[in-house]
Amino acid sequence: MNQLYLVPDIQDMEHSVQLAEEYGCAFEYNDFYAPAVLDDPKKQEEIIAHYKKYRSDFSKDTMHGAFLDVTIHSSDARIREVSALRIHQSMEIAKKLGLRGVVFHTGRLAGFRVDYYLTQWKEMNAAFFRELAEKYPEQQIYMENMFDEAPDVLAGLAEEMKEVKNFGVCLDYAHAALTGCTGREWVETLA
């Protein structure tokens, strides 16, 4: 992304806009990942209308997509179905706003490194996000570490998806700092 992002405070947009201008930041919206918002189109429109009062160009901005309980790699078809719905809802909001991209989380079970699970995680995420990238060519799709204990699994997905032009990884350094790996290891492995 090579861009500094600021999460705007919807209650104090004047200050958020001022900070963004002062530091050359784009916005990363964190208002649209909650199930209550995703289930309420009226609430979505209210949030969008509020942001549009303060900004007309969203082309450098991103948003956090749905991530609470989202498990696209689940062996349970019904969980995958709801997870796919939430991800598609996120992409539609991004498309409506004209955002640069959407950040999703890996959704992995922290510390669970059984081979079949990691293989399934990579294969199912690659298939799903490859298809999603084709459907939404105007938006970037980023996969961010969250409770991942090391960068290798996310790096494996990035390698698998390297030919997909609108897919990439997003390193959350604060999440990475909670692991036993150094920041350097995260950066070098994901680079």
Describe each model-derived feature in a short phrase.
Residues I10-D12, D31-Y33, F67-D69, T106-A110, ...:
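Active-site-proximal loop/turn and secondary-structure-junction residues that shape catalytic pockets
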Residues M1-Q3, E14-E21, E92, L154-G168, ...:
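Histidine-acidic metal/acid-base catalytic patches
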Residues P35-D40, E144-P151, A174-R184:
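Active-site glycine- and acidic-residue-rich loops that bind
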